[in-house]
Amino acid sequence: NRPFLVVRAPGSGSEGTGDLLALRGDICFPIEVKSSKSKKLYLSGRTFDQLEALRDVGNRCGLLPLYAYRLKGVRGDSWRIMKVEVDGLSGKLRHLSRSIPSLPLTRNGKEYLDWDKGMPLHRFLSLVCKSDGARTSVDSFPSSSIIPSMETVISN
């Protein structure tokens, strides 16, 4: 009922903006998009710096940064959503944050992406629609309606 404006950030991946910024009157998500053939993606160097910048922006601005992780070669819903842990969330973002899985930790306590531990995109969309007061169930997003383009999916 209430669409998102999705903006691709110029110089994406820098300054904590992530690759996409999904905006709606009541919520905003900076989103870092990653894809790989491997179910696990370890963050180091530039990718770890991106994570730290996302966390910093989330903490300073009261936003919920997300990772959208696509597993290449998977048919259907190949996207998984995970959140970056931040402090000071309020309102709907705080409520949504409780249901979205965090980035898992290695044995050394370092965050990484694990496709199996992420939330399927269709469930995330259902969750966001429910936060808008719409009556939407996970079953109302048939797999055929999932569009492979992340920018298109979130803006619908």
What is the meaning of each model-derived region?
Residues 1-11, 60:
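Acidic-basic catalytic patches of nuclease active cores, encompassing PD-(D/E)XK
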Residues 7, 31, 66-68:
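Hydrophobic/aromatic beta-strand patches that form the interior of the parallel beta-sheet core
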Residues 16:
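Beta-rich catalytic cores
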Residues 20-22, 26-37:
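Conserved catalytic cores of phosphodiester-cleaving nucleases, focusing on short active-site segments
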Residues 36-70, 74-75:
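Short, charged, amphipathic alpha-helix that recurs within catalytic cores of restriction-modification
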Residues 64-135, 146:
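Domain-level recognition of nuclease-like catalytic cores that cleave nucleotide substrates
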